[in-house]
C-alpha cells in the first residue's frame, strides 16, 4: 500500500509536467483561452519569483528555500507512511510532495515555474494570480493533511 502513495506522488508530478510541456507550446503573446463557462482561462506565464511575483531575481535563494521545504515534506511523507491508518494524512502528503517536486523541478531545470490557469471571479486579488496544477495539488494536500491531523487528534 505504501508504494501506491509513492506512485501517486510521482504520477501527480508527471501529470503537471506533461501539462506544462503542452502549455509551453503556446505562442508567448497568445490571447488567453477562456474555458467553458468563462470562470477560468488558460494563458502561459513564466514565474521567475514566488507566488504573487515576490523575490523575483533571487532564484538561487528560492531554489534553496523550496528544496528545504520539499525535503521536509518528503521526510514527513516518509514518516507518515510508517504509521497505521492515517490515510487522509498520507494522501495529503502525497499531493503536497507531487506538487512541490514539480515546481522545484521547474525552478532548477528552467529557472522559472510555468503557470497557466487564471480565474475570473468577483475577487480582484484572485484574478491577478495565475496557477498550475501543482499549486492545486499543494493546496489540496495541505487541506487533507490538516483534516487528517484534526481527525487523528480527536481519537
List each model region and its residues.
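Alpha-helical transmembrane bundles and membrane-interface segments of multipass inner-membrane proteins
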Residues: 1-155
